[in-house]
Amino acid sequence: MQIHLANPRGFCAGVDRAITIVERALEIFSPPIYVRHEVVHNKFVVDGLKERGAVFVDELVEVPDDSIVIFSAHGVSQAVRNEASSRGLKVFDATCPLVTKVHMEVMRASSKGTECVLIGHQGHPEVEGTMGQYDNQDGGIYLVESVDDVARLEVKNPSALYYCSQTTLSVDDTADVIDALRAKFPAIEGPRKDDICYATQNRQDSVRELSADCDILLVVGAQNSSNSNRLRELAEKIGAKAHLIADANCIQKEWLANAKHIGVTAGASAPEVLVQGVVDRLKEWGASSATERPGRLENIEFAVPKELRVKQVS
């Protein structure tokens, strides 16, 4: 039984930045530091930050006056920003810069009176934040998840229409939805570069290659992690058995029956320590080796807010 490690896997630059923002805020300003929603979708990461004094809340009403609040990597609506501003809360924004790029696309469309179609998953925090960037009462923003949704979609002005997408979607499925939008609305425009982020693309590419060579794929990630779920779905489409697991304790030994080649990857919010835990468990159960696959080098870094770059001296 051999282990094959996908490359790249795990943390992306946006997740690294978001976690660093919370860590630096805790170091510089001391607990409690409030965070709206899970800063990233991973219980291991969130629990570690809680232990250090981060307090995770669903809405700003739970944040006391004169407090520091951090917006999660998934981004927030303009209404949330306005609420924080009106209350005078000190805000550090951990929104991934690639999500902010999509926000700006929606704001530009809104300012021009162009209607917007967002490809994304209903209820995901990133989608809620992106939808909340559109405020033109004469236009509209519409959410679609599938080609079937496009078939049912009716807009006010098909000649002034723009599409964008959640950054963590299936590359293949999103391409199908974009094709359907262009077929139904020939005048629709979109971003010059796909909104799906580099890390999502790279991790899906590595899983596409790995799944063809493995009997089973284990994806380390949270159940509410969009990009982790897309990795599992992609492996299954290719024909591999795939399981999304939070950590090594979730692996069921019967999954590995007759498996000679086991692939392991991790979603963009899953730390490498969890991957290593999976490798160690598989070796306990008889795996002979763990081989790192070649893959695309990722050297992107996103800067944290200036106020958090150097520890303040009192």
Curated annotation (Swiss-Prot):
Pathway recorded for this protein: Isoprenoid biosynthesis; dimethylallyl diphosphate biosynthesis; dimethylallyl diphosphate from (2E)-4-hydroxy-3-methylbutenyl diphosphate: step 1/1; Isoprenoid biosynthesis; isopentenyl diphosphate biosynthesis via DXP pathway; isopentenyl diphosphate from 1-deoxy-D-xylulose 5-phosphate: step 6/6
Sites where the protein binds isopentenyl diphosphate: H41, H74, H124, S225, S226, N227, S269
Any Pfam family the entry gives: LYTB
Keyword Cytoplasm attached: no
Cofactor(s) in the UniProt record: [4Fe-4S] cluster
Catalyzed reactions: isopentenyl diphosphate + 2 oxidized [2Fe-2S]-[ferredoxin] + H2O = (2E)-4-hydroxy-3-methylbut-2-enyl diphosphate + 2 reduced [2Fe-2S]-[ferredoxin] + 2 H(+); dimethylallyl diphosphate + 2 oxidized [2Fe-2S]-[ferredoxin] + H2O = (2E)-4-hydroxy-3-methylbut-2-enyl diphosphate + 2 reduced [2Fe-2S]-[ferredoxin] + 2 H(+)
Family designation: Belongs to the IspH family.
Protein name: 4-hydroxy-3-methylbut-2-enyl diphosphate reductase
Organism of origin: Pseudoalteromonas atlantica (strain T6c / ATCC BAA-1087)
High-level lineage: Bacteria, Pseudomonadati, Pseudomonadota, Gammaproteobacteria, Alteromonadales
